[in-house]
Amino acid sequence: MRSIFKTSLIACATVIAASSAFAQKAGDNIVSMGVASINTDTDVGPLTNSGQFTPLLVGSTANISSETTVSFGWLHMYTDNIGAEFTLGLPPTVTQDLTTPNGGALGTSHPAAAKIELWTPTAVAKYFFGTSKDQWRPYVGLGASHVSFHNIKAKQTADVQALAGTSAALSSTWAPVYNAGLIYNIDDKWSINGSVSYIPLTTKATFVGDAAHGTTTTTGDIKLKTTDYVIRLGYRF
């Protein structure tokens, strides 16, 4: 009986020791995969048109759809508390609605006026609180994202084609990333990472349309304030 009890104590001690040897320590690399929910608030600045549409575009607003996509991450720990993570998601296609309250002949409501493919590769430096033996590791991060817009397709309606039927472009830009999150270490290999990021940016919009009186170009700044919610399953090696 004493031998069995002693063996049980040793087994328990081994389990406890193993469970305390979690992750996020100097030299660790953690790859992860999960989902990201992308939510964007849009602020359209004054739009200028080379033709007769400028007065019709005063007060224009836009709304970009929220989308969910697959997210990948690679985290490298330089110390037990400092790491850097590179993330990239499968580029989601977002839908942009446009409202022109003074649109007149253009109309005032243009749902699904354009579809846009969004790329946001991101690098973030992170500070992890606690120690490498903690099962829960909250963190804060600061980084940058290169945001670019591809395969922009304008809706095939007369009003939208008059504004952007020939071409539509949004300039690529670098944007700051403010990040906070929490890692739960399942064991010394597997973990769950949940985070939220805020990415504010300004992009230059250039739309070329084919109106009845000829080709016109519309330009203006669009401010995007994006909040990303991410959860991923990670593996340390």
Residue ranges with predicted function:
Residues M1-G27:
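Cleavable N-terminal export/targeting peptides
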Residues F22-G73, D228, G234-R236:
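Short glycine/proline- and aromatic-enriched beta-strand/turn motifs that initiate or cap beta-hairpins
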Residues Q24-D28, N39, F72-Q156, L224-F237:
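Gram-negative (and chloroplast) outer-membrane scaffold detector with strong preference
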Residues D43-G51, Q96-A105, H150-A162, A205-H213:
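Outer-membrane beta-barrel translocator domains and adjoining extracellular loop/strand segments
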Residues L56-S60, L106-A114, Q161-A168, T215-D221:
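Extracellular loop and loop/strand-boundary signature of outer-membrane beta-barrel proteins
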Residues A62-T68, K115-T120, A168-A175, D221-K225:
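Short sequence motifs at beta-strands and strand-loop junctions characteristic
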Residues T93, I186-F237:
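Predominantly the C-terminal beta-signal and adjacent terminal strand-loop region
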Residues F129-N193:
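A charged, solvent-exposed segment within the mature domains of Sec-exported extracytoplasmic proteins
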